[in-house]
Amino acid sequence: MKAVGIVVEYNPFHNGHAYHLTQAKKVAKADIVIAVMSGTFLQRGEPAMVDKWTRTKMALAGGVDIVIELPYVYSTAPATDFAKGAISILTAVGCDSFAFGSEDGSIQPFLNTYDLIDNNRTEYDALIKDSLKTGASYPKSLYYAYEQLTQKFPAPYIDLAQPNNILGFHYLEAARTLDSNIKPLTIPRIAAGYHDALKQDSSIASATGIRKALASTSSLQSVQKVVPETSFDYLTDWHRHYKKFASWESFWPLLQFTIMRHTPSELTRYAEVTEGIENAIMKAAKNSSSFNSFMEKIKSKRYTWTRIQRMITHIYTGFTKEQLQSFEAPSFIRLLGMSAKGQAYLGKRKKDIELPLISRVAAANDAMLAIDIHAAELYNLSIEQGVTAQSLPKDYQTPPIRN
């Protein structure tokens, strides 16, 4: 059986995602689709709007055959490590290819871009350092260095100002760095851009647009036409039970408490928290009544919103720099769900899979997995605050979902 891999967050699963996985399967001429999906906390440093199990159900209903969790260590990391973790897992599970969405759907500009940077690495790194010295943020410095090289060596390259192109580049980079035989493929994105708001006449919207619409109206009807019926039903069921979708705003009381129980110097223990920002974080926490006002007090030219959110995520979950440095690569494959075809694939390929395949978490003993379970427990704690409805599934007790 031929498998194509995709890297996803499904926050939530929408019509654009359904198109992407259908096209990925078609272009790859694959029998099954394997998705590596972030768990409870995501790459932009924020909690998923619904838990990993609900999103797994959405994925299986939408046509994914196997859903594997991207460990917290990678799901909350900068793009380079996020991609490395995901591509490592897709390679280990035996995918022949991986597919990602991009602005124009052509793989050659991605290959050109990788070669440009790889062949001029010394100059590229020097340009980044020069830009950082001016006080520019790291993402802006990367883009500056890239622009300088593209002007010096003209060719068809990708636009690295586009979020999906950035991730696509890092997926390709990870595959090359890992010396993986997995083949890169790209699918053109349709209609909605990453940050676009919902449009009344369109059935396609970005996940960001959907979350913003729900945050501003609290009406599920506003997003009904841009998500599959099954996703809409799962979102409706979630909201009926928990009265909210997860966000840092809804987590704010517990997040504020977590920050304030530390001293400023203690905050620097946590992953990505750079010395110099700890006092600003503490001062903002003490003087803010909401997450948004907290963030507005900290963000600056040097620290992007996303970078600060990742720091905050690690403070909230207690994930330290020491822990981060102790991991070099994914150490297991956590199975979240599978279709009948997915189960058949695993049955045939199980002996060839390069990492331990975990379906019964309670029987496993792995330091990286323990971090995932702890993050899920803290996520559940915030969701269940003030709610008398049924409890969320206990992460270490929940078996893979079968569809």
Swiss-Prot record:
Keywords: ATP-binding, Cytoplasm, Ligase, Nucleotide-binding, RNA-binding, tRNA processing, tRNA-binding. GO terms for cellular component: cytoplasm. Its main location: cytoplasm. One of its GO terms (biological process) is tRNA modification. GO terms for molecular function: ATP binding; ligase activity, forming carbon-nitrogen bonds; tRNA binding. It is found in: Cytoplasm. ATP binds at residues 7-20, 101, 164, 189-190. InterPro entries: Rossmann-like_a/b/a_fold (IPR014729), tRNA(Met)_cyd_acetate_ligase (IPR008513). It comes from the Bacteria. Its EC number is 6.3.4.-. Belongs to the TmcAL family. Catalyzes the formation of N(4)-acetylcytidine (ac(4)C) at the wobble position of elongator tRNA(Met), using acetate and ATP as substrates. First activates an acetate ion to form acetyladenylate (Ac-AMP) and then transfers the acetyl group to tRNA to form ac(4)C34. This is tRNA(Met) cytidine acetate ligase. It comes from Lysinibacillus sphaericus (strain C3-41). The gene is tmcAL.
